[in-house]
Amino acid sequence: MNYKIICYLLFLLLGFAIIFMATVVKAQPLPGTCYTARVVRIIDGDTITVYDNAGCFHRIRLAMIDAPEKEQPFGAEATNALSELLKEGTVSLKVHCIDKYNREVAFVNCDGKDVSAEMLRKGMAMHYHMDFDNCEIYDKFEEAAKRHRQGLWAQDNIETPWDYRHNLAKRRHSNVHKDLFQA
């Protein structure tokens, strides 16, 4: 009888160990880490999910740009433009930092092209200034797109993605207060 109980407990322990090992999350790469991965999802015009050679998924925010949100004018176009740039599927990444949403902010290259620079050049994103050397090239791509009224720069009244998010949060907060007083 004791033998059966011991075997049962060992079996349970083994099961828990397997479950624990399966749920262990790989630590995120440190800034400066470079790796190659396959793009598995385009979330929006500046965020993707990749699958690396070690079998881990990573949520990536493209460094140096901020694309319109999906609900904004040119949001869908920015997402489609990023999808077109990444159609080869394999990218090389260099991690710059981890953002407050736990995404890797990374420089992404596909088919020999800096994806952030290409999004700026096409007018599908705005330059998001970061603490990084050699940012001037990103300013130049954005300025050229503005001059030629490419992509989102064809609009007359442009709301930046960061202003859009800020204003959306204010509207949501305002609506919550309205609902409380109307109840």
Model-flagged regions — what are they?
Residues 2-183:
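Small beta-barrel nucleic-acid-binding modules, primarily SNase/OB-fold domains
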